[in-house]
């Protein structure tokens, strides 16, 4: 899921959908929709106030991945290095934004390589590192860690604040050889519905999601990062049916 035209369209559909419409989108788009901002300027609709949250799904998490022998341990060390951002993706746009915010624009050589070639490019020293955004643990970061040995950069509190994104900590040991917590940023993503969904349906959907979450984590590791604590990222109201389930399991929202 990306903060893309598709995510905007998911929210716009609320104006015409009825009943059991369920969609995923970053919470920031719900805020914009309900306040007539950004892509929703001039497209205000009272139905946007009927949007209700159900549960979080894996966030898009920023990774600045460097070869372990690159000598890079903090963002400022990127000056003079060759970095792969990719093209057109959320991670590429976000990575370019961060370089500018952190005073590195023009100081980092950007490699003209596609992101799907990042791991071999890192291994053959064509690049010093790459930037990727995905739910952690990200498969390409695991592959890089296993094949080359990596460092994943942490951001300072000031850098996180400048990004205007949500702070996220990737636990130590998530990636082979990376034995300390990684402080980074994320774009939360949440499953939403509308108030017309019955309380019982919302309750069952939410209950089944959390019951299945551990099974999903066994087949796709990034589901392990989804915890009830991520409900803190929700913007707007949570559906009454979902609230009933959270109350049952003792989760404060």
Identify the residue ranges that each predicted region occupies:
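Sec/Tat-exported extracytoplasmic proteins
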Residues: 18, 23-26, 33-36, 68, ...
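Pocket-lining segment of extracytoplasmic ligand-binding domains
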Residues: 26, 35-37, 44, 70, ...
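An extracytoplasmic/periplasmic, membrane-proximal ligand-sensing/linker region
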Residues: 113-117, 123-124, 134-147, 152, ...
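Bilobed "Venus flytrap"/periplasmic-binding protein-like clamshell domains
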Residues: 1, 56-124, 228-232, 236-241, ...
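Short, glycine-/small- and polar/acidic-enriched structural segments
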Residues: 1-77, 84-87
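Extracytoplasmic/secreted cell-surface and envelope-processing proteins
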Residues: 10-11, 31-33, 63, 92-94, ...
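Ligand-binding clefts/hinges and TM-proximal coupling segments of bilobed small-molecule sensing domains
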Residues: 77, 81-82, 88-97, 166-235
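A generic structural signal for alpha->beta connector loops
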Residues: 48-51, 80, 107, 149
